Amino acid sequence: APTSYTDVMTEQSTRRRTFFHHRGANALLRPEHFDFSRTCAKIFHLGYLLLLDALDANGEDGRPCAADVLRRAHAAGLRTSVDCVSEHSDRFRSVVAPVLPEVDVLFANDFEAEKLTGILLGRGVELDRRAVGAAARALVQLGVREWACLHFPEGACACSSAGELVWQRGVRLPAADVAGTAGAGDAFAAGVLYGLHQEWL
């Protein structure tokens, strides 16, 4: 199977991005491809739900196959982490939500959080902090075991399993220092996971 790839086109004046994605081999990734018996890793990060056709498909238990992979990773002693993709569809509740009880740390942007919870966050207008907090808590109530981490242009909000909210404002950089926003969510997730790995929290 061909390698998966994504071409990102950014409109120069508005910085609006368009993604052209080819699933390639990622569509064929299946539960049997994962062996956690000999790993010494602390964290298993799975991304992106909604782009992994075989793992997004329902397994024998009626949940997406990704749930079984995450369950086995957790049973092997790994902290599980998941990121999903901003897809314009109604699949968030059928593919992502059933997996959440197997997730220790969830990453979602404002669009994805709205799709998962049905709570409008004020995207593109003025972010509603109360709604963001409610959405983060709702994701924990849907099953996320440790942290539901939401990120958006204005910053980030994380909700712990105890319902505690942690807020972080976005960093303001000079426009000349910003080459683009492609990968911003991935960089955010990497930073949070590094902090968890190093036991900063």
Give the residues covered by each predicted segment.
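Ribokinase/PfkB-type carbohydrate-kinase core domain
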Residues: 1, 5-167, 171, 197-200
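Conserved post-catalytic alpha-helical subdomain immediately downstream of the catalytic base
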Residues: 172-201
